[in-house]
Amino acid sequence: MFKKFKPVTPGTRQLVLPAFDELTRQGDLTGKRTRKSVRPNKKLSFFKKSSGGRDNLGHISCRHRGGGAKRLYRVIDFKRNKDGIEAKVVSVEYDPNRSAYIALLNYADGEKRYILAPKGIKRGDQVISGEGSPFKLGCCMTLKSMPLGSTVHNIEMRPHSGGKLVRSAGLAAQVIAKTPGYVTLKMPSGEFRMLNEGCRATIGEVSNADHNLCVDGKAGRKRWKGVRPTVRGTAMNPVDHPHGGGEGRHNGYIPRTPWGKVTKGLKTRDKRKSNKWIVKDRRK
């Protein structure tokens, strides 16, 4: 769910924000009447200094980054390798470091871990990992154990490497076919891809599916998130961009990146990279 605002100021005229109805509040845990959000688990979070888009030499490696509010990084369990032990969902929380929500699990042996929250999971639900796990929302198992047509997320590229694929808000892949040793998945991009049957995935769709409907409404909200302005190349000087300079407006060139490479239509995939695991390309 999301909420719109009355246009009482220019910044709220286009503003669309998530309603955060799925999140657990402090009042849910304490019984008091409060809408304050749950604080992150201290042992599973730490302060991570912002790079400001710079590499280890201080050079800009990613443009348009810098500033923004400080963030606590939450340690997420992408491997889901604690097998055979049931866990209870303590809370569903906001994470400023990703578009999806996260869920805090309390295992039967007392250990706590954060995972990506599947869509529809709520406080008090039970989840479990490993072979023989029930086919239930939030449970994790290998791809070979899942029936055809299953909706999955947080998928490993190689066994025991931890989830790498389908982790953003609202995404899900589908199990399409099984062959000896491999499972074919339909990815959110439309690509059909083969993966080792020993790779793990979590059942369900990633939470916060309305994330793509949100509108920041003003430049200042982008700055709070650590996003700096984007300047057009034609507004720069020739020393700064291939499009820079010229008396007045000039557009008699092929569009290029700030580093001089053709920016439209140029293939960037390494020709030596194998395509044998891609059954159907997303572009076809």
From Swiss-Prot:
<dbReference type="Pfam" id="PF00181">
    <property type="entry name" value="Ribosomal_L2"/>
</dbReference>
<comment type="subunit">
    <text>Part of the 50S ribosomal subunit. Forms a bridge to the 30S subunit in the 70S ribosome.</text>
</comment>
<dbReference type="GO" id="GO:0019843">
    <property type="term" value="F:rRNA binding"/>
</dbReference>
<feature type="region of interest" description="Disordered">
    <location>
        <begin position="232"/>
        <end position="284"/>
    </location>
</feature>
<comment type="function">
    <text>One of the primary rRNA binding proteins. Required for association of the 30S and 50S subunits to form the 70S ribosome, for tRNA binding and peptide bond formation. It has been suggested to have peptidyltransferase activity; this is somewhat controversial. Makes several contacts with the 16S rRNA in the 70S ribosome.</text>
</comment>
<dbReference type="Pfam" id="PF03947">
    <property type="entry name" value="Ribosomal_L2_C"/>
</dbReference>
<protein>
    <recommendedName>
        <fullName>Large ribosomal subunit protein uL2</fullName>
    </recommendedName>
</protein>
<dbReference type="InterPro" id="IPR022669">
    <property type="entry name" value="Ribosomal_uL2_C"/>
</dbReference>
<dbReference type="InterPro" id="IPR014722">
    <property type="entry name" value="Rib_uL2_dom2"/>
</dbReference>
<dbReference type="InterPro" id="IPR012340">
    <property type="entry name" value="NA-bd_OB-fold"/>
</dbReference>
<dbReference type="InterPro" id="IPR005880">
    <property type="entry name" value="Ribosomal_uL2_bac/org-type"/>
</dbReference>
<dbReference type="InterPro" id="IPR002171">
    <property type="entry name" value="Ribosomal_uL2"/>
</dbReference>
<feature type="compositionally biased region" description="Basic residues">
    <location>
        <begin position="264"/>
        <end position="284"/>
    </location>
</feature>
<feature type="compositionally biased region" description="Basic and acidic residues">
    <location>
        <begin position="240"/>
        <end position="250"/>
    </location>
</feature>
<keyword id="KW-0687">Ribonucleoprotein</keyword>
<dbReference type="InterPro" id="IPR022671">
    <property type="entry name" value="Ribosomal_uL2_CS"/>
</dbReference>
<keyword id="KW-0689">Ribosomal protein</keyword>
<dbReference type="InterPro" id="IPR014726">
    <property type="entry name" value="Ribosomal_uL2_dom3"/>
</dbReference>
<dbReference type="InterPro" id="IPR022666">
    <property type="entry name" value="Ribosomal_uL2_RNA-bd_dom"/>
</dbReference>
<dbReference type="GO" id="GO:0015934">
    <property type="term" value="C:large ribosomal subunit"/>
</dbReference>
<dbReference type="GO" id="GO:0016740">
    <property type="term" value="F:transferase activity"/>
</dbReference>
<dbReference type="GO" id="GO:0002181">
    <property type="term" value="P:cytoplasmic translation"/>
</dbReference>
<dbReference type="InterPro" id="IPR008991">
    <property type="entry name" value="Translation_prot_SH3-like_sf"/>
</dbReference>
<keyword id="KW-0694">RNA-binding</keyword>
<keyword id="KW-0699">rRNA-binding</keyword>
<comment type="similarity">
    <text>Belongs to the universal ribosomal protein uL2 family.</text>
</comment>
<dbReference type="GO" id="GO:0003735">
    <property type="term" value="F:structural constituent of ribosome"/>
</dbReference>
